[in-house]
Amino acid sequence: VNSDPRFAVIIGSLYGKKNKPPFTPETKNKDKGIITKNKLKLTFEDDKKIITIETPGGQKVTLDDKGKSLKLEDQNKNSVLLDKKGITLDSGKDLILKSKGKITMKSGAATEIKSGADLKAQGVNLALKASAKAGLEGATTEIKGSGKVVVKGGMINLN
C-alpha cells in the first residue's frame, strides 16, 4: 500500500481438503498447471517438455517437444497429429475436403486410396494417365458409354 513494501497486499488461495491440487505434490515439482473455475486447463510437464491446453468438453491441444509432435483433438473423436512420420487426420465420422479452388494431391512415393465400400470418382471429364502401365482389374469389368466407345492401341488383344 502506498508503494511501501512493508504493507504488501497478497491475493491468492491455498489448497485444502475441499479444494485439492490438480497434481499430486512431489519433491521434483515437475508438473505445473492452471485450472480455472470453469475447469479450463493449461498444464506443463517440464521433464517431458509437454504443454497441454484442455477444455472440460474434451477439446485438447498437446505440444510435445520431446516426442516432436503436435496433436489437436475434439470431443467428437476427431484428431490431427503432426509428428516425425507426417500428418495424420483421423475422423470419428466423415472426412470432407472442400475448396472453392482446385485440390491437388502430390506424392514423392506411391499413393494409395482404399475403401471398405464403393470408391467413386465423378467429374465433367475423367482423365487417368500412366507413364508406364495402366491396369484395370475386377471380378467383373464393364466399360460403357452412352455414345460411342473408342479403343485405340498399337496392338489390341481381345480374349
Model feature map: region roles:
Residues V1-Q122, L126-K129, G135:
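Structural signature for extended repeat/solenoid scaffolds and their inter-repeat hinge/linker regions
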Residues D118, N125-N159:
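Long terminal segments
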